[in-house]
């Protein structure tokens, strides 16, 4: 078995979370390069493949860079009384490097960080390897209308493992079908009707109609307790 000692890192930076339940939260971001999918609406398509812009780093090198960026911005966290700064582990798809993350994430926890995993929720076996280190899991449901195939089985298994650590995000485009929204809500309800669902309309391309968003929201709300319609704020303010 090959031991993974380095992963391709596209960027490490400080910003504010721009989407989902934690919109506005100051975070450090660790963006890994490489993904197991190619979704039509992807807003970080530059990180799908491992390009020359990605640097292969060890866990110690990543920790050092994260600590450096945190120290540069720690006054932001202090002013907001945030004792445990949050790191968003994102991509690409970070769980393709689950074996590496098993070594990195404990080091980040030991250094006082809380961990926020952003994932396409298609690799439940990989999630099992790191779930105990994750504080929050932002999982995207991927629809056949955009990705060309369904992942309902994987999404349900992913939710079973994540349980109360997760919320679900669905990107809505003009191609999204009502049945995909209903199916998403039913899959979530099969685990817990209290898991939050974020309906996130695309604002770049294939923009959905307002009436469709209203219909999708109303149908999901019939099934789940917590449904929200939210756009990506970082795109409005043109920040990362």
Predicted feature locations:
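Short aromatic/hydrophobic contact patches that present stacked aromatics
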Residues: 29, 86-88, 167-169
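Generic marker of residues within folded, mature protein domains
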Residues: 20-22, 79, 189, 219
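N-terminal pre-triad scaffold of radical SAM enzymes
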Residues: 4-41
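Conserved AdoMet/S-adenosylmethionine-binding subsite of the radical SAM
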Residues: 96-240
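Conserved Radical SAM active-site core
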Residues: 7, 38-133
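Conserved Rossmann-like nucleotide-binding pocket used by diverse enzymes
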Residues: 31, 90, 198
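Polyanion-binding catalytic cores of nucleic-acid enzymes and NTP/SAM-utilizing transferases
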Residues: 1
């Amino acid at each position: 078995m090959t031991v993974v000692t380095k992963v391709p890192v596209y960027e490490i930076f400080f910003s504010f979370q721009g989407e989902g339940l934690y919109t506005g939260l100051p975070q450090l971001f660790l963006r890994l390069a490489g993904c197991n999918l190619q979704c039509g609406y992807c807003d970080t398509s530059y990180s799908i493949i491992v390009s020359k812009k990605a640097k292969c780093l060890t866990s110690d090198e990543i920790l050092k860079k994260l600590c450096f960026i945190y120290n540069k911005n720690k006054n932001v966290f202090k002013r907001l009384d945030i004792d445990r700064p949050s790191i968003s582990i994102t991509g690409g798809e970070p769980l393709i490097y689950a074996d590496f993350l098993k070594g990195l994430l404990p080091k980040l926890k030991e250094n006082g960080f809380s961990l926020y995993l952003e994932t396409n929720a298609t690799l439940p076996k990989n999630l099992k390897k790191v779930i105990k280190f994750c504080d929050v899991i932002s999982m995207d449901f991927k629809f056949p209308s955009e990705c060309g195939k369904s992942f309902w089985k994987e999404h349900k298994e992913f939710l079973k493992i994540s349980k109360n650590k997760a919320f679900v995000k669905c990107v809505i485009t003009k191609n999204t079908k009502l049945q995909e929204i209903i199916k998403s809500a039913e899959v979530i309800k099969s685990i817990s009707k209290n898991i939050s669902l974020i309906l996130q309309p695309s604002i770049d391309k294939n923009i959905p109609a307002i009436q469709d968003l209203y219909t999708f929201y109303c149908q999901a709300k019939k099934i789940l307790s917590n449904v929200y319609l939210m756009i990506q704020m970082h795109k409005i303010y043109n920040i990362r």
